[in-house]
Curated annotation (Swiss-Prot):
Pfam families, alphabetized: Bunya_nucleocap
Location relative to the cell: Virion
GO term, biological process aspect, one: symbiont-mediated suppression of host gene expression
Similarity-based family: Belongs to the orthobunyavirus nucleocapsid protein family.
Domain remark text: The N-terminus and C-terminus are involved in homooligomerization and play an essential role in viral RNA synthesis.
GO molecular function: RNA binding
Keywords assigned by UniProt, alphabetized: Capsid protein, Eukaryotic host gene expression shutoff by virus, Eukaryotic host translation shutoff by virus, Helical capsid protein, Host gene expression shutoff by virus, Host-virus interaction, Ribonucleoprotein, RNA-binding, Viral nucleoprotein, Virion
Function: Encapsidates the genome protecting it from nucleases. The encapsidated genomic RNA is termed the nucleocapsid (NC) and serves as template for transcription and replication. The NC have a helical organization. Seems to participate in the nuclear relocalization of host PABP1, thereby inhibiting host cellular translation.
Classification via InterPro entries: Bunya_nucleocap, Bunya_nucleocap_C, Bunya_nucleocap_N
Subunit structure: Homotetramer. Binds the viral genomic RNA. Interacts with host PABP1.
Name this protein carries in UniProt: Nucleoprotein
Length: 235
């Protein structure tokens, strides 16, 4: 009869994970140690960190970004991908979303223009920049290009979702990558609720995304003006 006895197993997903609670716990633990310099280094090296972790079998790792060290669950190594992730665990993806929200809050809570300028010159979003989107498009839009921001659809005004929708429509991204955003809450609304109640807000957000100067990454406005003198007009 032993072959008919079954036991519960740990979930391999993050079912029941509350991003807002996770973010608050992150802030409590790291508020005194995290700073703009460390966040800049993280975002510029997140892809490299993922690649390095994919070669290490350890379940947890302690990458260091400048002087800031943080423990993360290593779900990038092929043999670790089905390991359970607890609600209070950090992954590179969660860390990306948390730090993007932290930067946005730092930016919005500081009315001092010199402080805001420091944030804008320190924090670089390589994904946004490669698509020609910069800080002057708006803090929420610029930061929404960071992975993990889809956990906070209300905070980022649906931009993580609508940026994804635009990229799918333009053939820049596979539709499967929208799944994470489509499972998230919007404030207290579950996905099935906001999909029916927030259509107008999502359409407005998408329209703003469509009006961005996409595809202008890599060349400054000065360089573009120079090329125009020789009859070369870039999109």
């Amino acid at each position: 009869m032993s072959d008919l006895v079954f036991y519960d197993v740990a979930s391999t997903g993050a079912n029941g994970f509350d991003p807002d609670a996770g973010y608050m716990a992150f802030c409590v633990k790291y508020a005194e140690s995290v700073n703009l310099a460390a966040v800049r280094i993280f975002f510029l090296n997140a892809a490299k960190a993922k690649a390095a972790l994919s070669r290490k079998p350890e379940r947890k790792a302690n990458p260091k970004f400048g002087e800031w060290q943080v423990e993360v669950v290593n779900n990038h190594f092929p043999g670790n991908r089905n390991n359970p992730i607890n609600s209070d665990d950090l992954t590179i993806h969660r860390l990306s979303g948390y730090l993007a929200r932290w930067v946005l809050e730092q930016y919005k809570e500081n009315e001092d223009e010199s402080r805001r300028e420091l944030i804008k010159t320190t924090i670089i979003n390589p994904i946004a920049e490669s698509n020609g989107v910069r800080w002057d498009s708006g803090a929420e839009i610029y930061l929404s290009f960071f992975p993990g921001t889809e956990m906070f659809l209300e905070t980022f005004k649906f931009y993580p979702l609508t940026i994804g929708i635009y990229r799918v429509k333009q053939g820049m991204m596979d539709p499967q990558y929208l799944k994470k955003a489509l499972r998230q809450r919007y404030g207290s609304l579950t996905a099935d609720k906001w999909m029916s109640q927030k259509v107008t807000a999502i359409a407005k957000s998408l329209k703003e995304v469509e009006q961005l100067k996409w595809g202008r990454g890599g060349l400054s406005d000065t360089a573009r003006s120079f090329l125009q003198k020789f009859g070369i007009r870039l999109p």
